Amino acid sequence: MFSNGHFHIDLDPDAYGDANKDPFIQDEDKLTIAELIPRILIERNSFLNVTEESLQEEIDNPRAEDEANNEVDVASELDIGDESVENGSILMATLAETSLDPVELFQKQKLDLSKSINSALNETSLSLDFVSLLISSVKPNLAKSTISPHLNKSVPLGSLNSDRLSNENDDDDRNKSVAPKETPKVGHGWKLESLHKVTSLFREASENLNEQVLKERRYWNMINSVLTNDEVLFKTRDPLNNARAIGVKYGYGDSGSNFHDKGLAILRKDTVTGEISFNPINYAHKLTSKVFRYIRIKILSEIDGDFMLTGQSLFENDFSSSKDQIINDIEKARFFLFEEDLFYQLTREAKTLINYNVSIISNKIIIEINNEIIEIESVVYDENNDDELNNYYQNINAYSSINNGKCQLILKFFKIMLCCYYKYNLKLKQKIPTSLTKWKQSNSHPLVLRPLLGNIRHELNLKNMQSIIDRLIAKFKESLECKLQVDKFANLEHRSENPFQKSIERPVSKFNIVLKSKRSAYLKIDLELTTNEIFVNLIINMNVIKFKCEDDFKNNFNGVNVLQINFNDFHEIEECLDWTLLNFVNG
């Protein structure tokens, strides 16, 4: 229907029938109450504003309202007609779209709406990222919570800044207020101030670099001095801050020691001076504060029924031989680690000698032998107590220090024997691994305390045996002629002249006794004093052979083996020898 050059379209729903009915067009007469009331609220607003007068007026003037609506439509169409050609084309496109199927039109408008929403969301996200990046230099925590993950990975925080720009009017007023002659001076002042700031910054940077260079030079010079001292360095992590560091091995693990403390330390760098400090770590790679201990030997002799101190070893070591303090610290830690390992090995051996007058009390090993007491004590090192280190209170007279040299020799013997044990372990590690070598590595015990105690007891056993023989010879001197020959340490006669061979082999000594009776019969008694692998047990092997005449004895012919027996007690062998000699005299 055309009117004034425009056309109107009226849609009659009944013309399509029920089969072709548009689902988006609803018949108001067929709406339910639940659907009708919301539409009325949308069109007429709330029921509170409905009055009888307004309803009557609406009923009386339906045409006036339609004409007003038509006038509004015409006015809007005239305004559209006055638009530009581009707006007219948009209007024609819109009219063309209205001629499409309603479902297609709805889907198209829905797609346009989603695009607009996505565009708005993108612009909002960009704006939020811009603001977040802008405030990141001032409030980084707040910016991290609002910035997008992609921008956070791509752009570092604080990289965007802002400044305040004044208006042109303010600049003009400021320029007018400043005198023309003062403007160059202000600019020169700013430039001069900037130059001073840059100069100071460069000077500070140069000083910092020089300090860093001096620190690094001092650090690496000290590292080089440690390396020049033939120390073993390795890379590690500092347990304090897990930073990379250089460590040093000051222990004896590579020399054959199996002590639990491997002797590892961190050479920590001082961030202020650049110097390195010596910081030991334990087997769990944790920092530890060590208490240094050293071994002291004492000898107490029995005098008038009381045991008095007659000898004490001296602490002989100087930890200031090098001009570098770090070298002195390493040598000091190495010395006390050796002392700690030595006392540990001595304690291991002493536990197996409890039945031989050896006892362990706290940090002290006590050995009772031959009316003397030998004390091996682990003493805390105090470098400020010179009186104790130099035995000032012990050396009060000559008699109280008569055994000082003996104590010093015992201490040196222990240290040398521990070095021999290291060498033995090192040879086992270098051999081809077999079941025997593995067993030896896990079951080997050092020979440090046992050789000393065994040889002391062996000397006492020789004296006791000599006294027994002397008593028996004196008892039968009227009936027998005696000839005695003593061969001490007979097992070492045909060996090399190694002074330590005596310390690692069980001692063996022999007594050869030849007795001649009045009937010219000869009795040969061979006594052998030895021990087992414990070094402290007494084993006496006795062999008795009888000859009828001197010729048989000299030719070692027709000898009769009278007795062959072993003893572990001097009282028993004395009785046996007494009976043997008595039987020989009477027979």
Swiss-Prot record:
InterPro entries the UniProt entry points to: Mediator_Med17
One GO CC term on file: mediator complex
Subcellular location: Nucleus
Region called Disordered, residue ranges: 156-186
Gene3D superfamilies: 6.10.250.2620
Main location: nucleus
One biological process term in Gene Ontology: regulation of transcription by RNA polymerase II
Binding partners and assembly: Component of the Mediator complex.
Family (UniProt): Belongs to the Mediator complex subunit 17 family.
Protein name, entry field: Mediator of RNA polymerase II transcription subunit 17
Species of the source: Scheffersomyces stipitis (strain ATCC 58785 / CBS 6054 / NBRC 10063 / NRRL Y-11545) (Yeast)
Gene: SRB4
